[in-house]
Structures are given as structure tokens and as C-alpha cells.
Amino acid sequence: MKRNPVVAGMFYPAEYHELLEMIEYCYLSPRGPKELPSKRGNYTKPLGIVSPHAGYIYSGPVAAHGYKKISENVSGEVTAIILGPNHTGLGSGISTMKGIWKTPFGDMEIDNEFADKLWKECDVLDIDENSHLREHSIEVQLPFLKHLEDLNIAKFKFVPISMMMQDYETSIDVGYFIAKVAKEMNRKIIIIASTDFSHYEPQESASKKDAIVIKDILELKDEEIFIDVVTHNISMCGYGPVIAMVKAMKDLGAKTANLLYYSTSGDVTKDYSEVVGYASILVK
């Protein structure tokens, strides 16, 4: 199947040159890393990032921090496992798909072999295109990856995993099998957990709540992420994808995590009465 983008022209520009200008702005923005990716890294081990998925004007500069780190740590052919929450309520509880996703920068090919093996080994995972057709949380990551590819940083395939079910046990299962399949297939992989943090709360409340779960991520405590999201009523939409990423990365040998940048929508709109939190976090 060839999937068409559903939020191009809304979350990010649909036209090639406008999108390129926007992504370059994200890197060079005062809230971004303030420099463009400029060199090919050397892949030595798997890399995980937490990346936001709002409109680029709000969260793109935050996301650019993570993609700058990816650019410095990849080379050759790389499979990007992209986990995102299912906002639409369509399709299976946990699903991947095969085929190609279109972007304004060109097509992104799914690693069908990895997706198929993961589906066969992970009982909670279905192959279901309906989960992905209208969902934006994975789509908004692809232009950043395709941009790195166009800079000859690496050649990417990806595996989309949409998570409507985000309970702890399911999330851990998904993470376990991602790591298992990556080892069995000897793939160079990066794992991207797509999430925003607190939604539509005052800046002070949102930043305090987000700091709690960010601390858990930085300490690689997957169970505490789930407990604190529930206990503190943190309206983080992709805690399941983050738990799965942390579990997979630990199984693949990760020992450290670093907060690259935290910001809120209020830093753009200057309205701090109702904000959404965004963070870029590196796990390796």
C-alpha cells in the first residue's frame, strides 16, 4: 500500500521548498539546536529518542534537537522504528503495516521484512492499515528523516507502530519484541517514541507534571513512567510508545538518557494559560 500524507499543509508545509525552509528554520531557531545537520555520523549502537508531534511551528524546533543527534550517530542503511499513539480510535489496538508512505520530500519505504517478522513474533501486534490512514503522530516524523536522507546522512527505512492500547504490560511486550527482532535480524536501528507531554494546562502546572515523567525517562524507569502518568494525571498522549522505546533500548544495552530540550506551546504563542509540553530526549 502507498499511504498519502494526511496532515501535510496543516502540521507542516505540503510543498517541497516550503517544507525544506520550515525544517531548516526548526534547526536554526532559538528553540532548536541552532545549526543544521552537517556531517554523517558513525553508527555504533542503537539510538532512541522521544520526539514531539505537534505542528512544526510549535514543536518542530524541539524535534530538531533529536534529529540532530540522530544525524551524528547513523550511517549506511538504518531502520527507524517509529512508535506513536493512536489519536483517531481507528483500527487495531497495536498495529504496523507494510508498503510506502508518501512525503513532500519523496517516498519513505517501510522495512517490510522487519514489520513482518515483528508481527509474527509479537502476539499483541496486528498488521492493520486502518490504524495509520488518518493518524499524524508517526507521519510528522518522516520529513525530518527524509531530510537527513537527502543530506546523505543515511538511508532510512522505517516501521510504523500505532498504539491505541498503552497499558504497561502491552507496552513492555512491544518493546521486548522490537529489541528481540532487531537482534535476530542484525539491523541497524533507531527507535523514535512520538509523544507530546501535558495538554492544555497552565504553564506552571504542565512544566511541573512533565518534569516528573521526564525524570523517569532519564532514569530509564519504564514502570515508573506508567505509574506517574496515572498517579499525577499527566495528559501525555504517547506514554505507551515511550515505555516501549525505553524497554527496547534497555534490552539493546542502553545505559543513559539526556534531556536535549523542553519547551511548551506557550513559548511560541506567549499564552501561558493553556499550553502543551514538548520534549526531545536521547537514549543510548
From Swiss-Prot:
Coiled coil: none
Organism from which the protein derives: Methanococcus maripaludis (strain C6 / ATCC BAA-1332)
Family: Belongs to the MEMO1 family.
HAMAP family named among the record's database cross-references: MEMO1 (MF_00055)
Official protein name in the record: MEMO1 family protein MmarC6_1286
